[in-house]
């Protein structure tokens, strides 16, 4: 897997892992999408991913599996009347807000896809937002787990199981 690591970016004591080299290489990109897709249970209805890098991986997985894709947007990226719910959460270096667009997914099974897991805050925010819509976030997968500290437990968790090699 091709990636770059930047220490102390965007702040001191933060390790930024960039998978752009894997996206540029078409074969590598397809390989990662396939590996991520293999972790998604067959009965999942929607792939859910946070803005911004999660959109790349999540939408590719949704397309690969023929599933719907629900984008979790950053604050003020949607018109106010298009937002169903929002949730404030902590990342390793900031406090952010995720918003979920109005959609009818009641009783659906959703699966989280993102590039990196650092604190579990984004995953927790996704769980809260999906719960708000009376749907179920049944699991998640990331390419790289920087250092899971506290995670909301769900049935299918695949954090740091992909073969990450430089």
Per-region residue spans from a language model:
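Active-site-facing substrate-recognition patch
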Residues: 1-44, 101
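Short glycine-rich phosphate-binding loop at a beta-alpha junction
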Residues: 44-51
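Conserved acidic residues
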Residues: 45, 108, 138
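Short, ordered loop/turn segments at secondary-structure junctions
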Residues: 52, 74-76, 146
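Short Gly/Thr/Asp-enriched flexible loops that form oxyanion-binding sites at enzyme active sites
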Residues: 56-65, 127
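Short, glycine/charge-rich flexible loops or terminal/linker lids adjacent to PRPP-binding catalytic cores
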Residues: 67-111
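Acidic, divalent-metal-coordinating active-site segment for phosphoryl/phosphodiester hydrolysis
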Residues: 114-127
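PRPP-dependent phosphoribosyltransferase catalytic core
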Residues: 124-166
């Amino acid at each position: 897997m091709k990636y770059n690591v930047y220490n102390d970016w965007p702040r001191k004591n933060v390790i930024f892992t960039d998978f752009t080299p894997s996206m540029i290489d078409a074969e590598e990109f397809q390989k990662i999408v396939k590996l991520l897709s293999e972790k998604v249970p067959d009965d999942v209805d929607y792939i859910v991913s946070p803005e911004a890098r999660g959109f790349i991986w999540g939408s590719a997985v949704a397309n690969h599996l023929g599933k719907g894709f629900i984008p979790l947007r950053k604050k003020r990226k949607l018109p106010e009347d298009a937002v169903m719910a929002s949730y404030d959460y902590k990342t390793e270096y900031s406090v952010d807000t995720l918003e979920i667009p109005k959609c009818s997914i009641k009783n659906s099974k959703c699966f989280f896809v993102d590039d990196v897991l650092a604190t579990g805050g984004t995953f927790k925010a996704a769980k809260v937002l999906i719960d708000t819509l009376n749907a179920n976030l049944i699991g998640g997968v990331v390419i790289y787990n920087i250092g899971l500290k506290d995670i909301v437990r769900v049935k299918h968790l695949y954090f740091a199981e992909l073969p990450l090699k430089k």
